[in-house]
Amino acid sequence: LAEDGVIFVSIDDNEVFHLGLLMEQVFGAANFVATCIWQKRYSRESTSAIGDVHEYLLVYAISPVMFKEARNRLSLDEKSKKAYSNPNNDRRGPWQSISFTGAGYRPNQMYQIVAPNGNTHLPPEGRHWAMVENEYRKLEAAKRIWWGKDGNGVPRVIRYLSEVDGLVPWTWWPHEEVGHTDEARKEIQGIFGTQTAFDTPKPVRLIERILRIATQPGDIVLDFFAGSGTTAQALLNLNKEDGGDRRFILVSSTEATADAPDKNLCRDVCAE
């Protein structure tokens, strides 16, 4: 891996705990980044005592600090953009208010704030203001503090949509955003003419999510379990989208079949 490199490993409930121990042995606990949850089904699974509708993506980095600096934010989707509005016709555009407190106690961030209506405010128990007082005064002077529709609320910071450069990735990946197994099987059928060519296909959107987070336009991506070549397809899609020059290395232990008894090692990676 590169110094800012990262590895994503997909696994289900059967081996996730064994894999976690192995990953900690190889990479070390300090290099753990996250365990992402992929919602692989959109309908309830009723054959088990508790329905299985997700898989895991274990994420480790050579340097979590460097990966955090290098990783990309995700574009705001329409649902996220709807959280911003402009009820007061602010010339700076749509905005939303966000909390002005943080967890814990910080002595220099426990000052008293006087609201326009004369009410005084201190941080709630166990919390502190998000900024020191002089920084708060700058926001106040710029009319970046929101006191609620009637002016009787607690101080909140106004954040404009134009200032948001994307969403920090989080660990919950719902099927609406990254696809599900049925979608993956349909993609397989579109290429190979059958949905049974591979047992555990991944939707292209899932791999695209990983690549959007973890890669830059000139990076090399290695997939040890290439399967149907979904990683290659997702990478080429992303290159087409942003003009990047990402390259891939795919590794697969191709199983012998009636059509390929010699276990061909090389095949075309492009499909129309």
Positions of PLM-derived features:
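Short, hydrophobic/amphipathic alpha-helical packing segments
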Residues: 204, 208-211, 229-232, 271
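Beta-strand segments within the central parallel beta-sheet cores of soluble alpha/beta enzyme folds
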Residues: 34-37, 226, 247-250
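A phosphate-binding catalytic loop at a beta-strand-loop-alpha-helix junction
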Residues: 219-238
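PRPP-dependent phosphoribosyltransferase catalytic core
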Residues: 237, 241-272
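Class I S-adenosyl-L-methionine
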Residues: 1-220, 242, 255-257
